[in-house]
Amino acid sequence: MIARDDITGLILAGGRGSRMGGTDKGLQPLRGTPMAMHTMMRLTPQTGALMINANRNLAAYESFGVPVVTDSVPDFAGPLAGMLAGLEQCQTGWMVTAPCDSPFLPADLVPRLAQAIEAEGAELAIPVTVDTDGRRQLQPVFCLMPVSMLDDLIAYLNGGGRKIETWATSHRLAEVLFDDAGAFANINTLDELRTHEAG
């Protein structure tokens, strides 16, 4: 079994926040607490260490008390660039990622992904949910991976790849079904944020 202490959680807060008017999503308050802090509080009991990937407002993220890593690939190259930055700095054998705007992520996310990797002999694990139409939805931004994937990810990015799902599905992938699709909801707009504030 992959030990909790051998897993570092990486909160992905390095994006432009373009669907939120360019604001830094991770620092937007939800019920009085920055969204990235909600995600951090969800991941803390499931991992041995935490990091945040951010490319602006670094002092604000550093005030959360965990290491902050910036993209080594320029121009906000997307979540994979954040994953790369995390893998480059990770001090444990495994890393799990979650976006900063996922304050409801499951309390058993990491142990279930780790269990699936062990059971299936997989390289990576990501959650799968089922939408209201019965379609399976991969949630690839939530990904448990070994740090040994670093060179492979560098090669994928150097080849122009930018989609997490394409990269993940090119490996032995454990897809783990979670019943609560709402737990993986991203808060992408200010309207969605207001809805969750009221909820």
Swiss-Prot record:
Q: Which Pfam families match?
A: NTP_transf_3
Supply the source organism for this entry.
Cupriavidus pinatubonensis (strain JMP 134 / LMG 1197)
Family under the similarity heading? Belongs to the MobA family.
Q: Where does Mg(2+) bind?
A: 101
Subunit (UniProt) = Monomer.
**Residue sites binding GTP per the record:** 12-14, 25, 53, 71, 101
Main location class = cytoplasm
What Gene Ontology biological process does one annotation of this record name?
bis(molybdopterin guanine dinucleotide)molybdenum biosynthetic process
Disulphide bonds annotated for this chain are none
E.C. code: 2.7.7.77
Lineage summary: Bacteria, Pseudomonadati, Pseudomonadota, Betaproteobacteria, Burkholderiales
Recorded GO terms, molecular function? GTP binding; metal ion binding; molybdenum cofactor guanylyltransferase activity
Domain free text: The N-terminal domain determines nucleotide recognition and specific binding, while the C-terminal domain determines the specific binding to the target protein.
Localisation: Cytoplasm
List UniProt keywords, sorted A-Z: Cytoplasm, GTP-binding, Magnesium, Metal-binding, Molybdenum cofactor biosynthesis, Nucleotide-binding, Transferase
What task does this protein carry out? Transfers a GMP moiety from GTP to Mo-molybdopterin (Mo-MPT) cofactor (Moco or molybdenum cofactor) to form Mo-molybdopterin guanine dinucleotide (Mo-MGD) cofactor.
One GO cellular-component annotation of the UniProt record comes to: cytoplasm
Report which reactions are catalysed by this protein. Answer: Mo-molybdopterin + GTP + H(+) = Mo-molybdopterin guanine dinucleotide + diphosphate
Cofactor dependence is on: Mg(2+)
Recorded protein name is: Molybdenum cofactor guanylyltransferase
